[in-house]
Amino acid sequence: MFYMNCHRKGIVFIFIATVFLFISCEQRVDKDKLTITAVMDDIKQEFAPDKRVALFNIEYSRKGNETILKGESNLPEAVASFKQKLAGKNIYYLDSIQLLPSSNLNGFTQGLITISVANLRGRPAHSAELVTQATLGTPVKILKVEDSWYLIQTPDKYLSWVDSGGIMPL
C-alpha cells in the first residue's frame, strides 16, 4: 500500500514538473511577443496614430524557433525606428515588411482621378465602407495594386481604395 501511494505521488510529481516545463518554455515566446507588441504599439502611437492617414500594419508570427515580422507600411521612418528598437532589445527576426509604394507598380506611383466623382473605399470591394470621395483630376499617390483596385493616398493624406476604372496611373 505504501509503495503504491509513493508511486502515485511520483507520477503526479512528474506530471506537474512536465506541465511547468512546457509553461516555462512557452513564456519565452510570449515574452518576445509581448516585447514586439509593445514596441509596435509605441511606433503606431508615435508615427501612425490615425490609421486613415498612415499605414503601419505589421504582424508577428513564429515558425519553429524563427520570429517572423510581416506586413506593410507607407512610413519608412516608422519601419526604421521599429527595427532599431527591436535590435536594441536583442530581438532577431525574419524581415518580411514591405514598404509602400509597392515595387510591383513599375514606377507608376502617381495617378489622377478620371471620373467626375470616385468613391474611395475602406477595403478593395464595392461593398466596402465609403471612406471619402475624390473629384475628376485629383492627383493621388498610388501605394499598391490588388486585383483591379488601387490603394491610394489623396492630397489630404487619406488612405483608401479606388477601382481601376476611376484612376489613371502616371
Task: Give the location of each predicted region.
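N-terminal secretory signal peptides that target proteins for export/translocation
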Residues: M1-R8
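Sec-dependent signal peptide recognition
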Residues: R8-I16
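C-terminal motif of bacterial Sec signal peptides marking the signal peptidase cleavage site
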Residues: L21-S24
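Bacterial signal peptide processing site
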Residues: E26-R28
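Gly/Ser-centered flexible loop/linker motifs
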Residues: D30-K63, A118
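SH3/SH3-like beta-barrel superfamily modules
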Residues: E66-I68, E72, V79, Q133-S164
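Boundary regions of SH3-family modules and the immediately adjacent low-complexity/disordered segments
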Residues: P76, A80-N104, A125, Q153-L170
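Beta-loop motif signature
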Residues: I113-V140
